[in-house]
């Protein structure tokens, strides 16, 4: 079974995040960019599938700027056998629709596509479902755990009121929560071997796609962006005043 793991490089959550008011996009320059933590957990699930012999090949796929190589190498050390890095200046600031189109084209030959339920920078949580729709495949959302038997993947999803057990025939798309896997620090051998693994750098054109705002048949448009208004001081009520009311 070929497993594709979707990976995203995001600004470190421990640092302050700012929005560029002229574009409405997250400022990524001048900050530490890292592999999204939830993607490390997805890699842990893929590593277990590989260890069990269920996954015969694990490929990491990311869409991002050229400086995402460091993040890719970490994922190669964690679980992946190879990686596909989609790079194009026209992809900067892509909305979820364009992101799903590009990632779906890159991952279409996978038997199982694993993704984090939502990224820490955008939090849209819609890209996996969009990919499934584009590829015509079933989608299991927000799975806390998965099991694979023959050509069936089963995921357990917990809602506020109940627990759901969902099954789908592969090829399929599954989005995983932070409960799905526990990432492990790669050892020195894994880090060294990751430097030798293949990373295919491709463009949307290589995938048979056009990129950019004019290429999208439907897209989100940022209308305006403004700084959050400063918080006003709360009204102070003395103990004596409260007692008399």
Q: Which residues does each PLM region occupy?
A:
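N-terminal glycine-rich FAD/FM-binding segment characteristic of electron-transfer flavoproteins
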Residues: 1-245
